[in-house]
Amino acid sequence: MSEKPRRDTGGTGTGSGRSTGQSTNRTSNQQTGTGRTPTATGAHRQPANQSTGGGRSSSTGGRNTPTNQGNARPAAPANARSGNQPARGNNAPAASRSGGSTPAPVRGGGATPAPARGTNTRNARSQQSRGRPQPEEREREREAVLRRPPTPTTTRPVMRPRGPVALPPVMTVRELSEATGIGAADILKTMLKAGMIANINQQIDYETAALIMTDFGIETVENMPEQMVGIVEDVKEVLRSQPPEEMRPRPPVVTIMGHVDHGKTKLLDAIRSTRVAEGEAGGITQHIGAYQVEVNHRKITFLDTPGHEAFTAMRARGAQVTDIVVLVVAADDGVKPQTEEAIAHVKAAGVPMIVAINKIDLPTANPDRIKQQLAALDVIVEEYGGNVPCVHVSARQKINIDGLLEMILLVADLEDLRANPNAPAVGTIIEAKLDKSRGPVATVLIQNGTLHLEDNVLVGCVAGKIKSMFSDSGKRLRHAEPSTPVEIIGLEGVPQAGDILQVMDDLVLAREIALQRQRQQRAEAMAASARGTSLEELFGKVKQGQVKELNLILKADVQGSLDAIAHLIEQLNQSQNEVQTRIIHRGVGAITEGDVNLALASHAIIIGFNARPDPAARRHAEQHGIDIRFYNIIYQLQDDLKKAMAGMLAPTFKEVVEGYAEVRNIFRLPTREVVAGVYVTDGKITRTGQNVRVLRRGVVIHDGKISSLKRFKDDVREVTAGYECGLIVEGFNDIEIGDALEFYRQEQVAATL
């Protein structure tokens, strides 16, 4: 039977050792008799200097005398201090008054010794956490679960649709996967193979989706939303669908085409009796102007297209909306490349043509030569047995202008041009710009129906309500009939030249369709960008130094100028492959501070074509050194772009031989360098800036530089023909008597496109 613990107030170190021994013996007896293993509190001797003060100490089997004088208690084990609670049992030790505790004995097992003095508590924690699964084990378990095949109850077979699948004009990859039953991952893989980098939420257009589905053997059809039914995509289809009894004669739309400076604007100026040409920069029309004149109580609408070759796209748009083309050819200059280009556009548009041979008042005029040149291009005039009318005029002297107008009306009567003035208006945007005070302004040619004030319109990707209309002379209009060019205000954005204008009953519906078209346009642009980026051909060449880029930000007064500059840059890029010009941003209107920031971030040059920076943008550009170039003549911009691109080309070098010499003696220095005693036979030797080529029996054995040049013991800069000298070829000691030396210089030659 265990004794009760007693208080010992006068114990010494000897008593402490006696108490320890008794405790140990009794613990051993308890292990033999009961099979329970208490913690041996007296197994480790505690130093005297670790006394913690007075208190009552308890023992599991007998008395435990304090080790030091002063009523001290034994120190708690390390695992008790680490926060482990003692197990409760019959032999659980009693807690001391100071709150310390000793671990309880563990039933059915061996004794768990208390950690020795200085044991780290982290070891105790790691021992206790050995039973927990480690991160590697948890990862292996997770992978095993992922590899586990799905149960039959959760497996759902993919149902491929039968027959064509109806797809919207714009959709995400996820929506395409849901509509076709093809996994999104498979679709993304197919897009990646096709050079398109996308994600599951990226929008794609119907054409891209249909192309992807062909790889999976699925047919698709485009499902047009109900609100898209009735939207005009082709004006010719609208004209063909009109009731014949509603059709009325309309004025002809005439486009004047021809080579630069052949007198197109002068001819139109003579017709309108105004000075349009004097207001144009450099005498060249910068954007399409639409004008209407009255001849013999009949109206004729003229489109004045630019004459330079860079405005190819603008001339093409003019041919698409025109009824008759007047091809102007200068009698003293003949057929030029732009003349041939205009003929190609006319033939592609399938519209009748009238040849106007201008400048017949000049003494060098030769109309017959012009007709022969046209016949070589399959444009046979009536005098030569063809069906193309030909009129001789002089725009400067206003000779035979009436004859040209009568010929236009005659051809218009033969074409029987008609439209329905009672239908909702449909037209084509000729030009569009952003006016600082009036907002978006567009010039539209009405081709069918009548446009009224307050009409709701859909124009490409923008919508709006017609707030005001102006004629070509600036007169306010309340309505515009077919073949009438008008300037409209009230659109919610700047449309693109060539967009179709259509009157809508509901402005909300027009906005929804415009928004959907914008999304489709963005999806097409993203798809094109993804295809270009995934190829990485151009960018790879740029990184390798094979291709250099010239970044541009384009701002112009009208959309047509932007299109023309973009066409010009495309031609420059196609003409060579070493330097590529990239338009990182283009827009209509003034140069803003945002444009300057973009140029600063992308190391770009800002081009302002009839566009100037606002004060904030100008100050910002001056502070950061951003280059802003201003132009109002297209061919000046073309020349500067060529010069800028040529400056980015790798320079070429030309070899210029400046002297010859022969080796007549050899001197070896203690530094193991070899001095060649040479005689200059031709030209001169210069110590700096020259390379030397060593030839032995006509074969080049070394090419290097001169490290030293002397005459006798003096260093010299130059030795001319007929003199001897000594020189050291840098890094070459194998020179021999009889070798020939050739001295040359590399001169840089400016690169050209």
Curated annotation (Swiss-Prot):
Residues 19-43, 71-81, 102-122, 153-162 have a biased composition (Low complexity). InterPro entries: EF-G-like_DII, EFTu-like_2, IF2_II, IF2_N, P-loop_NTPase, Small_GTP-bd, T_Tr_GTP-bd_dom, TF_IF2_bacterial-like. It is found in: Cytoplasm. Residues 1-166 are annotated as: Disordered. Residues 249-418 form the tr-type G domain. GO terms for molecular function: GTP binding; GTPase activity; translation initiation factor activity. Residues 133-146 have a biased composition (Basic and acidic residues). The keyword Cytoplasm applies. Residues 394-396 are annotated as: G5. GO terms for cellular component: cytosol. One of the essential components for the initiation of protein synthesis. Protects formylmethionyl-tRNA from spontaneous hydrolysis and promotes its binding to the 30S ribosomal subunits. Also involved in the hydrolysis of GTP during the formation of the 70S ribosomal complex. Belongs to the TRAFAC class translation factor GTPase superfamily. Classic translation factor GTPase family. IF-2 subfamily. This is Translation initiation factor IF-2. It comes from Chloroflexus aggregans (strain MD-66 / DSM 9485). The gene is infB.
